[in-house]
Amino acid sequence: MQHDKNEDIYRLSTYYYDLPPELIAQYPAEYRDSSRLLVLDRKSGDLNDRAFKDISLYLKKGDALVLNETRVIPARFFAYKESGARVEILLLKKLGDDWEALVKPARRLKAGSRVFLSPDKPLVIEIVEELDFAGGRRVRFQDSVDEDTLLQEQGHIPLPPYINRPDEELDRERYQTVYACKSGSVAAPTAGLHFTPDLLKEITLQGINIVRIVLHVGMGTFRPVKNEDIRQHNMHLEYYEVAEDAAALLNLTRESGGQIVAVGTTVVRTLESVYNKDCGFLAGKGETNKYIFPGYQFRAIDKLLTNFHLPGSSLLMLVAGFAGTESTLAAYRHAVENRYRFFSYGDAMLVI
């Protein structure tokens, strides 16, 4: 069931589905591993409703569970123009001494503008230039600022727009995985949010290898697919790192007959980017704009753990590429009917 033959798989409209708004999780589950887990067998299309803690039943000794250890930076700032008008700045990535940022309302923030981080303090962010994407700006903090301290003290966790509330203190913990350690993302790799230290320890004691890689989630996560022919979509570049020991463990897993289980679409895109059919997994760091949709030949992964994704998103298309479009959409209908919780703070799906 993996490869659907008809042309509908390339139509954007195929990837829209009906989602009652009350199923969009606004807060995380009380306990990380108390989420639900929908298991989809991509060969048969069979579905199984489980608890997330049951994931270890689908892993075996010698498998590799691959985690993205990126950390979300508190990169959202609410600032003020000299007129007192409120604006929003989301830092995306460092550009030398400056930052690439997404600003709104963009029409009010032209090159040369200055904004203040509070109405009564003279802490300045300068808009240096306009960039080549909607709302994109190069911005610069005034010289004397310790940026790390500023991020921690005044930055907000950049919750996705479908979470209809301000960020709270709990988000500083719960919108990070328990293994997040390398700062650089503007959105969490959400499939990993369900793991606890105890569950990871239990999985390790089963003889499963835990492999850690990095992909910093960036602009691409906010970029909707707009082309009706999804093959025309382009992804933004995102930074990744695969260390020598991680590549070696992945290659050893394959050579030993183990399966590679990707925790999240970010891991899939990274592993598919560094896999070479002649040499296996290659260590390295760089940027990838790997775009995966139905018809793609997967080479690097055997199973995929992921959350439920937005209608019409490139992430949903990646899942459909792995599981088959019809099976994926049927799983989503099942999830809606059975009141699963959707998106970043929602439940998980395991494709086997």
Curated annotation (Swiss-Prot):
EC number: 2.4.99.17
Signal peptide: none
Keyword annotations of the record: Cytoplasm, Queuosine biosynthesis, S-adenosyl-L-methionine, Transferase
Main location (coarse class): cytoplasm
EC class (word): transferase
Record-linked InterPro entries: QueA, QueA_dom1, QueA_dom2, QueA_sf
GO terms assigned for molecular function: S-adenosylmethionine:tRNA ribosyltransferase-isomerase activity
GO cellular component entries: cytoplasm
SUPFAM superfamilies: QueA-like
Cellular localisation: Cytoplasm
Gene3D superfamilies: QueA-like
Family per similarity comment: Belongs to the QueA family.
PANTHER family documented for this protein: S-ADENOSYLMETHIONINE:TRNA RIBOSYLTRANSFERASE-ISOMERASE
Subunit structure: Monomer.
The protein, known as: S-adenosylmethionine:tRNA ribosyltransferase-isomerase
Protein source organism: Syntrophomonas wolfei subsp. wolfei (strain DSM 2245B / Goettingen)
Gene: queA
